[in-house]
């Protein structure tokens, strides 16, 4: 079956089309820009004051929740109880849309460190704020530099901290999962911390890749059963098993 390149979005009736366009450009866009500038600047200041962890847990989460709310996203989280308090995890999630970050950061109540592409470092305010909070930039064009970044990430993991990977490496432009890269699974094996497959549903209906056509709608994030690491764990098999769990969840 051929993968769809653009999933159907939430329908907006003709009577609501113009009011929603006004809401989108007069409310959503200004809030996204202002919240990133203002909260990002506050985060940078707090990081210089030694409050990076608080800024990440509280202000960054507030930023994400605010933006998801103004975009009229109805967020549902499932499987959160599968995660043990005080345990670190590697979270491996599919990546459908830019708004995946809002869902993970704003609604999971977890202390997260992100592994993100190097290009985001250049985004004004946001790039510096993420770096100061301890998120990890990876140069996808340089495998040696990417491995060095992942090694640095290992040093930042403490109890109750989770590292978020999008193992596809970029947003999927279709309904099919891309092949998974192995960095997340090598880190989990090296640190002996469980991998949690995370399936993100319907965010590409709220904001498809490569567009600014926001639509209101429900989205869902599911934490699947953690996969424990053992001395016999095979990296390739772990990667494929995680991908299979997420793929099956997306097709269900």
Residue ranges and their predicted role:
Residues 39-62, 68-71, 78, 84-143:
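Catalytic core of membrane glycerolipid acyltransferases/transacylases, capturing the structured
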Residues 1-15, 19, 147-252:
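Non-catalytic C-terminal accessory region of glycerolipid acyltransferases
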Residues 74, 88, 218-220:
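A residue-level signal for beta-strand positions that form part of recognition/binding surfaces
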Residues 71-78, 146-147, 203-205:
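Short gly/ser/thr-rich secondary-structure transition/capping motifs
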Residues 1-76:
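N-terminal membrane-anchoring alpha-helices
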Residues 67-68, 130, 156, 188:
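A generic structural signal for well-ordered alpha-helical segments
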């Amino acid at each position: 079956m051929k993968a769809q390149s653009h999933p159907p979005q939430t329908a907006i009736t003709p009577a609501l089309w113009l009011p929603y366009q006004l809401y989108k450009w007069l409310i959503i866009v200004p809030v996204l820009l202002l919240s990133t500038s203002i909260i990002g600047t506050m985060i940078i200041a707090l990081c210089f004051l030694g409050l990076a962890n608080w800024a990440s847990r509280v202000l960054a989460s507030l930023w994400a929740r605010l933006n998801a709310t103004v975009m009229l996203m109805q967020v549902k989280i499932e499987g959160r109880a599968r995660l043990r308090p005080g345990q670190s995890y590697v979270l491996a999630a599919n990546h459908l849309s830019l708004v995946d970050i809002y869902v993970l950061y704003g609604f999971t109540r977890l202390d997260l460190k992100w592994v993100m592409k190097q290009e985001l470092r250049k985004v004004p305010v946001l790039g510096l704020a993420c770096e100061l909070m301890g998120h990890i930039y990876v140069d996808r064009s340089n495998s040696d530099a990417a491995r060095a970044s992942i090694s640095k990430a290992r040093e930042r993991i403490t109890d109750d901290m989770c590292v978020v990977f999008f193992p596809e490496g970029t947003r999927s432009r279709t309904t099919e999962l891309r092949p998974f890269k192995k960095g997340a699974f090598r880190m989990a094996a090296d640190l002996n911390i469980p991998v949690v497959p995370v399936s993100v549903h319907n965010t590409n209906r709220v904001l498809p890749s490569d567009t600014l056509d926001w639509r209101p709608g429900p989205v869902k994030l599911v934490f699947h059963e953690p996969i424990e690491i053992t001395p016999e764990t095979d990296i390739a098999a772990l990667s494929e098993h995680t991908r299979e769990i997420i793929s099956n969840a997306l097709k269900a």
